[in-house]
């Protein structure tokens, strides 16, 4: 999987979604922020607490956090271990497109997490293996120049959401 340099921006440059796999030896500083898109944070390694709407989550490798499009959040990265994660940003337009296509509201998991005030998902081993495979496939398709690679990236993303 291709690892990208950390980009501190909190603005999407793509219309529907963005997929970033980032790795840092030195922890970046990220202030509290919010943005008008949804975020899936897939923690791979490091020493991290993540704060969402005032609630702190002590993360373990493989943990997933769901951040809604208005949640105030930030990672608290402590030094000592490399910090690796996958971040997926999803615009309202992406979910609108999926709803027109499937008739289903894929924002429901984000809404439910916010209502329960618990945004942490800790997948079982089998699910974790499959989610990592899908991230690998999304990364490969994202950087591919082959015909249909953008559609394939989106298909893997939808499978990840399901």
What label would you give each PLM region?
Residues 105-159:
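Amphipathic alpha-helical segments enriched in hydrophobic/aromatic residues interleaved with Lys/Arg
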Residues 1-64, 71, 79, 103-119:
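Generic protein-terminus/edge-of-domain signal
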């Amino acid at each position: 999987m291709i690892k990208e340099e950390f980009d501190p921006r909190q603005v999407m440059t793509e219309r529907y979604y963005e997929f970033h796999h980032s790795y840092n030896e030195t922890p970046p500083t990220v202030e509290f922020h919010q943005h008008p898109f949804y975020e899936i944070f897939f923690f791979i390694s490091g020493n991290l607490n993540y704060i969402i709407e005032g609630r702190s989550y002590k993360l373990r490798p493989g943990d997933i956090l769901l951040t809604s499009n208005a949640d105030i959040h930030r990672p608290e990265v402590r030094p000592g271990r490399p910090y690796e994660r996958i971040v997926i940003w999803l615009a309202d337009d992406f979910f609108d497109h999926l709803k027109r296509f499937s008739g289903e509201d894929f924002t429901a998991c984000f809404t439910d997490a916010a209502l329960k005030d618990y945004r942490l998902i800790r997948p079982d081993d089998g699910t974790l293996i499959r989610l990592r495979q899908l991230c690998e496939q999304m990364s490969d398709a994202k950087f591919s120049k082959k015909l249909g690679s953008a559609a394939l990236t989106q298909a893997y993303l939808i499978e990840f959401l399901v």
